[in-house]
Curated annotation (Swiss-Prot):
Functional note: Binds directly to 23S rRNA. The L1 stalk is quite mobile in the ribosome, and is involved in E site tRNA release. Protein L1 is also a translational repressor protein, it controls the translation of the L11 operon by binding to its mRNA.
Gene from which this protein is expressed: rplA
HAMAP family per record: Ribosomal_uL1_B
Subunit structure: Part of the 50S ribosomal subunit.
GO cellular component entries: cytosolic large ribosomal subunit
Protein name, as recorded: Large ribosomal subunit protein uL1
Length: 231
């Protein structure tokens, strides 16, 4: 059996197996256990009572986290005319049409979010095989295909997270950084949970939010007592 590292021993000594943690207690414990030199992300995994094999039970959407993600988000926008000027004014890092598509085909994909106005989809449609696998393909269901590109840019810059159930019916999202105050992480998670509950499929039966787990990039996963969350 492999020996535990010093960090693993510290985690094992602090984390109680089988315990459900109050949210703020969990957030504080993750910060205490963080000894990594870089600023870790704090992530949430939410197990939903859905059957993701059924198309009407796939849960997807977007939430603007009230306290942001702590990340500098780079945004590219496919649009033209007055909408292009509005997107730039809203803080977009790059705006264009065919020339932007050519840049992306050439490998310039240093963006976290790609947004498009409906009239630009003729151009964006050529990039499906490039943007799709990276999770960057604009989609009206999460607000990244919209005539109001300026608002979409502002939302992305403000810390909007996009989510979709994976093959196991789990939602994964980054909800901040390890140096966030626990209350700010809690507010972000509550905003996400509120939207997930609003999007509950009518065909979903039984318990909808089955399990909530909070973790950091290099830290343990802590199961959250849902009674400690107001959502």
């Amino acid at each position: 059996m492999a020996k535990l590292t010093k960090r693993q021993k510290a985690i094992a000594a602090k984390v109680e197996a089988g315990k459900q943690y109050g949210f703020e207690e969990a957030a504080a414990l993750l910060a205490e256990l963080s000894t990594i030199k870089f600023k870790e992300s704090v992530d949430i995994a939410i197990n939903l009572g859905v059957d993701p094999r059924k198309s009407d039970q796939v849960v997807r959407g977007a939430t603007v986290l009230p306290n942001g993600t702590g990340k500098d988000v780079r945004v590219a926008v496919f649009t033209q005319g007055p909408a292009a000027e509005a997107a730039l004014a809203a803080g977009a890092d790059r705006v264009g049409m065919d020339e932007l598509a050519a840049e992306m085909k050439g490998g310039d994909l240093n963006y976290d979010v790609v947004i498009a106005s409906p009239d630009a989809m003729r151009v964006v449609g050529q990039l499906g095989q490039i943007l799709g696998p990276r999770g960057l393909m604009p989609n009206p269901k999460v607000g990244t295909v919209t005539p109001d590109v300026a608002s979409a840019v502002k939302n992305a810059k403000a810390g909007q997270v996009r989510f979709r159930t994976d093959k196991n019916g789990i939602i994964h999202a980054s909800v901040g950084k390890i140096d966030f105050e626990p209350i700010k992480l809690k507010q972000n998670v509550e905003a996400l949970l509120s939207d997930l509950k609003r999007l509950k499929p009518s065909t979903s039966k039984g318990i909808y939010v089955k399990r909530v787990t909070l973790s950091s990039t290099m830290g343990p996963g802590l199961v959250i007592d849902q009674a400690s969350l107001e959502a």
